[in-house]
């Protein structure tokens, strides 16, 4: 039975039993506790916790899952996969243990002709939690499982939770006995290779708390309703129903191995070391394609690093198997062909998936070549000294200087019979991060001692009033000058002012700080910047322009209205551009960073490849259409689960509190978690003009734009520029493109004609060189200085022409040029001279030192350049001497 049919039978069985079929969620969810979705119940977590009312009492799904905690074991054994499909059925306060067990038994035992899986009931074993005799009794009573095939296990094996705070409960696992050939008797407690788990039924009833050293994630309460969460590994069931020994032999993985055999010329099953690499390729190729499809791009941390690691392991495994050419495009194609019947997005988004994977392969091949050589040298040096461990400093150098990832160093070290001082490596990495943080903090806070703020932070947060007003009365809590608390500051002095409340926005979320003032009777301070300390204390960096400020003063803090207006236009404009990007490019265009300041925005997003002119035009058009629609801009505070349910975009890696602020523009057009300041209606943003798009790193693109008045000024400048060009060309503005294109074509024609004239002039001297050829032994030699100013490319043309004029007569042509202080040279040797023993590449060594030059080539043609024109005569003499040695 093919995997796609197994998947379909599972879903159909539960739909017939009153379940709603729910599509797989993305592997990427806005859950700060999860790197990737790792279980079928993840998308239903709010229902299990009672945070949201489920829209259906019963559900069934086949969820894409990724677990990467044991990447190193993939391929070494046949039990590990990083990607798998988890089929599940779920009950939200509807049926419980008896219903779950009955439905599971029907599907696994029903004959295939009746829509079931047709497992032999006599080979089914089950386990139950040690404190759950009820489940065992149901299995015996409802399914007829003999008591001797029902085994009890402790919480380590038969109590399920997510490994993070959340729902959990006792579980009952279903096993299939593969027979004595796979291990010893005794049931699952004796041998889990022979007795293979195929389904886990979790009786969800508890809430698990934060991690405790002694208790793990301890139960901290009961769920509002008892629920059912089950998980069946589709790949394992496929292995059993297809009658193969392991998942790598199934219909969704073996073809990838087959493609690897084709590309490497090696055969799977011939030796263990090669088989490991074949399995790594098969597993990782599938996982990588699924991750890219769901919006992950290669990076240096988090999800991006996991993907990068998977792709690089594929490349290295293929190289070790003998692949000499790039392989990623073909592996991605096989995965798409295999998986798209169940996940059609792999086919519709294939071009992007392939581009991302191939881009990482291309980049890594450069690193792999250099890094492998350096690693081999390091490993050889360790072994030469009788050592067994690569020093942490060496691993750090490979990583930091040459971009060789530590996980690859560990893997290669193990293959070489060596270990790595991981503690030393991580210590150096930690030291590097510490220095970077200290440097950043010192730059940000003018080398201040950050401990000086601790007392102030402990006293409480600055109340930010800037969402509601631009002017607020406040008390001066502290003054800091040159890193020291001071009681007062006077005119001309730079001082940091800490207030109990402030309307000035502190730099965060990509939005730069407000500018403004702090005033009182006879007092005025200019606010140059506002920074946050510990995310709660507003530090106003100011200059005293008039009077004296004293700790304890009551002052008036004011944000500059024009500055704030421009900043809000920039920040709201960023949300518009983000929404437009996702509308034009799709949901995989995920924010990677931003900068918002008055009149300007910069937005970084995950995307592979340059945007087309049409895409940029569409993004600008969608953004400005939304501006013109005069959408209302609403902000509200809600809890994180509610915000996610509403569809608000959250950035992975951000730490959100229990309550979050949502900024909504035009209802579904844009909804993001955001703490910044915004306009009240989208029309207040003004025109948005994209300035350009560029790359800022692997898989990250950047767009920049002007907004509001700055956008108008930019467009006015562009209009004036166009008018000037039109005037110079003496055509109307609308005819400028056609006129420029016409002039460009004329220029191309003129350049070609000039090139032909130049070549003709160069070749006109060929006859003179032939006439002046000198006989040196058995060859005719032209060794001369070329006409001054002849470029390297023209030298080659001239030398080739001269060589051809000698026919079958053995001939050698050496021309040394002199252009802009450089000495380009060309050596041309015909076939007759080569047969005598004269080789062009070897001749370079005879005259190269005279002109401080280097070069090389093939026996018939060599070229290069030197930097010392004064050595040309000596170089030509050296050529004559060397030719005489060979052909004399």
From Swiss-Prot:
GO terms for molecular function: alanine-tRNA ligase activity; aminoacyl-tRNA deacylase activity; ATP binding; tRNA binding; zinc ion binding. It holds the Pfam family tRNA-synt_2c. Its EC number is 6.1.1.7. It catalyses: tRNA(Ala) + L-alanine + ATP = L-alanyl-tRNA(Ala) + AMP + diphosphate. It is found in: Cytoplasm. Binds 1 zinc ion per subunit. CDD domains: AlaRS_core (cd00673). Zn(2+) binds at residues 571, 575, 674, 678. The keyword Kinase does not apply. Keywords: Aminoacyl-tRNA synthetase, ATP-binding, Cytoplasm, Ligase, Metal-binding, Nucleotide-binding, Protein biosynthesis, RNA-binding, tRNA-binding, Zinc. Its cofactor is Zn(2+). One of its GO terms (biological process) is alanyl-tRNA aminoacylation. Catalyzes the attachment of alanine to tRNA(Ala) in a two-step reaction: alanine is first activated by ATP to form Ala-AMP and then transferred to the acceptor end of tRNA(Ala). Also edits incorrectly charged Ser-tRNA(Ala) and Gly-tRNA(Ala) via its editing domain. Consists of three domains; the N-terminal catalytic domain, the editing domain and the C-terminal C-Ala domain. The editing domain removes incorrectly charged amino acids, while the C-Ala domain, along with tRNA(Ala), serves as a bridge to cooperatively bring together the editing and aminoacylation centers thus stimulating deacylation of misacylated tRNAs. This is Alanine--tRNA ligase. It comes from Nocardia farcinica (strain IFM 10152).
């Amino acid at each position: 039975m093919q995997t796609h049919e197994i998947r379909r039978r599972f879903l159909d069985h539960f739909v017939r039993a009153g379940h709603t079929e729910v599509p797989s969620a993305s592997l990427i969810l806005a859950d700060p506790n999860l790197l990737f979705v790792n279980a079928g119940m993840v998308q239903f977590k709010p229902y299990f916790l009672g945070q949201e009312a489920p829209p259906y009492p019963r559900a069934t799904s086949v969820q894409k899952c990724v677990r990467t905690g044991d990447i190193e074991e993939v391929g070494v054994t046949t039990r590990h996969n990083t990607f798998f499909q988890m089929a599940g059925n779920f009950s939200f306060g509807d049926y419980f243990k008896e219903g779950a067990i009955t439905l599971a038994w029907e599907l696994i035992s029903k004959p295939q002709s009746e829509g079931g899986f047709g497992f032999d009931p006599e080979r089914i074993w089950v386990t139950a939690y040690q404190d759950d005799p009820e489940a065992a009794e149901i299995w015996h009573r409802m399914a007829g499982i003999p008591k001797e095939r029902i085994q009890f296990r402790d919480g380590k094996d038969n109590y399920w939770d997510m490994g993070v705070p959340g729902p959990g409960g006792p579980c009952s696992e279903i096993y299939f006995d593969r027979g004595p050939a796979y291990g010893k008797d005794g049931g699952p407690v004796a041998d889990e290779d022979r007795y293979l788990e195929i389904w886990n039924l979790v009786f969800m009833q508890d809430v698990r708390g934060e991690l405790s050293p002694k208790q793990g994630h301890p139960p901290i309460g009961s769920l509002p309703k008892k629920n059912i969460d089950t998980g069946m590994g589709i790949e394992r069931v496929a292995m059993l129903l297809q009658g193969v020994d392991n998942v790598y032999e199934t219909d969704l993985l073996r073809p990838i191995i087959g493609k690897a055999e084709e590309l490497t010329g090696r055969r799977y099953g011939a030796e263990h070391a090669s088989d490991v690499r074949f399995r790594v390729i098969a597993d990782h190729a599938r996982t990588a394609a699924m991750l890219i499809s769901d919006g992950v791009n290669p990076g240096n941390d988090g999800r991006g690093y996991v993907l990068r690691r998977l792709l690089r392991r594929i490349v290295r495994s293929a190289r070790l198997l003998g692949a000499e050419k790039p392989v990623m495009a073909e592996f991605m194609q096989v995965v798409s062909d295999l998986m798209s019947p169940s996940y059609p997005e792999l086919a519709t988004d294939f071009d992007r998936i392939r581009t991302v994977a191939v881009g990482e392969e291309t980049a890594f091949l450069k690193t792999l070549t250099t890094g492998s050589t350096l690693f081999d040298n390091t490993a050889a040096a360790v072994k030469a000294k009788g050592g067994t461990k690569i020093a942490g400093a060496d691993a750090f150098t490979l990583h930091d200087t040459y971009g060789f990832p530590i996980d690859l160093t560990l893997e290669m070290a193990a293959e070489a019979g060596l270990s790595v001082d991981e503690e030393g490596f991580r210590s150096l990495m930690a030291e590097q991060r510490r220095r970077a943080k200290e440097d950043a903090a010192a730059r940000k806070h003018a080398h201040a001692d950050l401990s000086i703020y601790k007392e102030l932070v402990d006293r409480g947060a600055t109340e930010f009033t800037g969402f509601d007003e631009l002017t607020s009365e406040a008390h001066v809590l502290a003054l800091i000058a040159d890193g020291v608390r001071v009681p007062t500051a006077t005119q001309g002095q730079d001082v940091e002012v800490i207030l109990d409340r402030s309307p000035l926005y502190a730099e965060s979320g990509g939005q730069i700080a407000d500018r403004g003032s702090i005033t009182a009777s006879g007092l005025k301070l200019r606010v140059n910047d506002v920074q946050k300390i510990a995310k709660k204390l507003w530090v106003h960096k100011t200059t005293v322009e008039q009077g004296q400020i004293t700790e304890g003063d009551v002052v008036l803090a004011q944000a500059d209205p024009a500055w704030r207006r421009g900043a809000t236009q920039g920040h709201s404009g960023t949300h518009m551009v983000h929404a437009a990007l996702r509308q034009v490019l799709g949901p995989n265009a995920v924010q990677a960073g931003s900068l918002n300041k008055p009149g300007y925005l910069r937005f970084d997003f995950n995307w592979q490849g340059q945007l087309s002119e049409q895409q940029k035009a569409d993004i600008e058009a969608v953004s400005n259409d939304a501006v013109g629609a005069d959408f209302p801009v609403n902000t509200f505070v809600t809890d994180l689960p509610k915000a996610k349910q509403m569809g608000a975009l959250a950035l992975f890696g951000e730490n959100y509190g229990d309550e979050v602020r949502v900024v909504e523009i035009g209802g579904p057009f844009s909804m993001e978690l955001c703490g910044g300041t915004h306009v009240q209606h989208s029309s207040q943003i003004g025109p948005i003009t994209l300035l350009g798009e560029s790359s800022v790193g692997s898989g990250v693109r950047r767009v920049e734009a002007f907004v509001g008045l700055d956008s108008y000024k930019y467009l006015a400048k562009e209009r004036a520029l166009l008018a000037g060009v039109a005037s110079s060309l003496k055509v109307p503005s609308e005819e400028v493109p056609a006129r420029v294109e016409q002039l460009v074509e004329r220029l191309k024609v003129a350049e070609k004609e000039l090139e032909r004239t130049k070549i003709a002039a160069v070749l006109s001297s060929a006859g003179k060189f032939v006439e002046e050829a000198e006989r040196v032994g058995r060859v005719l030699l032209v060794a001369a200085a070329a006409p001054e100013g002849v470029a390297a490319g023209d030298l080659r043309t001239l030398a080739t022409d001269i060589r051809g004029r000698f026919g079958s007569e053995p001939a050698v042509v050496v021309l040394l040029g002199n252009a802009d202080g450089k000495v380009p040279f060309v050596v041309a040797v015909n076939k007759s001279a080569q047969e005598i023993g004269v080789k062009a590449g070897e001749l370079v060594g005879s005259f190269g030192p005279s002109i401080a030059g280097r070069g090389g080539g093939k026996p018939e043609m060599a070229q290069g350049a030197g930097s010392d024109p004064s050595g040309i005569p000596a170089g030509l003499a050296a050529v004559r001497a060397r030719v005489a040695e060979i052909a004399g």
